[in-house]
Amino acid sequence: MLISKRRLIHAISYEGILLVIIAIALSFIFNMPMEVTGTLGVFMAVVSVFWNMIFNHYFEKVEHKYNWERTIPVRILHAIGFEGGLLIATVPMIAYMMQMTVIDAFILDIGLTLCILVYTFIFQWCYDHIEDKFFPNAKAASLH
């Protein structure tokens, strides 16, 4: 199977919970209808998934061409390239949908990125603990 059930559940739960958090938080903070902030969250998630596939495809080609090892500097370069490209794609979307300037949208996007970093850490930690407690053989089974 190309994508394991475990990875699919992980991805859907990660994106679903994040979407709810973003929609509610942006709606509350900016006094915007949840339809707007929820739609923005969906658009950003879709862009992120496609950008992830495109960016990683080409990054791995460069990595292979120059025989890069996945060292910390290469990981930092990867993270900066990925997040930088994502910012370029999402800032205009945020500015348009939230009816704000590009500068304000950039600041909001940086803030969202930092919040998502914290969310990702918490989600991963919780997911690992839940999986270990209720599905102790899931990781090993997905490796086969």
UniProtKB/Swiss-Prot annotation:
GO molecular function of the protein, one example?
Answer: antiporter activity
The entry summarizes the disruption phenotype as follows: Inactivation of the gene results in at least 8-fold reduction in tolerance to cadaverine and putrescine but no change in tolerance to spermidine or spermine. Deletion mutant also shows decreased chlorhexidine resistance.
Q: What induces it?
A: Transcriptionally regulated by the AceR regulator. Strongly induced by the short-chain diamines cadaverine and putrescine. Only moderately induced by the triamine spermidine and weakly induced by the tetraamine spermine. Expression is also induced by more than 10-fold in response to chlorhexidine exposure.
The alphabetical list of record keywords is: Antiport, Cell inner membrane, Cell membrane, Membrane, Stress response, Transmembrane, Transmembrane helix, Transport
InterPro entries, per database record: BTP_bacteria
Q: What is the effect of changing residue 15 to Q?
A: Loss of activity. Mutant accumulates cadaverine. Retains affinity for chlorhexidine, but does not confer resistance to chlorhexidine. Favors the monomeric form at both low pH and high pH
Q: Name one Pfam family in it.
A: BTP
Signal peptide positions on this chain: none
Q: What are its GO cellular component terms?
A: plasma membrane
Membrane topology of the entry: Multi-pass membrane protein
Activity regulation description? Protonation/deprotonation of Glu-15 may play an important role in transporter function. Cadaverin transport is inhibited in the presence of CCCP.
Q: Where in the cell is it found?
A: Cell inner membrane
TM spans (from-to): 9-29, 35-55, 76-96, 103-123
> Which purpose does this protein serve, as stated in its record?
Mediates the efflux of short-chain diamines when energized by an electrochemical gradient. Recognizes specifically the short-chain diamines cadaverine and putrescine as substrates, and promotes the active transport of these substrates in exchange for a cation. Protons are probably the primary source of energy for transport, however it was not possible to conclude with complete certainty that protons, rather than alternative cations such as Na(+) ions, are exchanged for substrates by AceI.
NCBIfam families recorded:
AceI_fam_PACE (NF033663), PACE_transport (NF033664)
Query: Subunit comment for this entry?
Result: Exists in a monomer-homodimer equilibrium. The dimer is probably the functional form of the protein, and the assembly of the dimer is mediated by binding of chlorhexidine and promoted by high pH conditions.
Please state which protein family the record places this protein in: Belongs to the proteobacterial antimicrobial compound efflux (PACE) (TC 2.A.117) family.
Q: What name has this protein been given in UniProt?
A: Short-chain diamines transporter
Q: Which organism is it from?
A: Acinetobacter baumannii (strain ATCC 17978 / DSM 105126 / CIP 53.77 / LMG 1025 / NCDC KC755 / 5377)
Record gene name? aceI
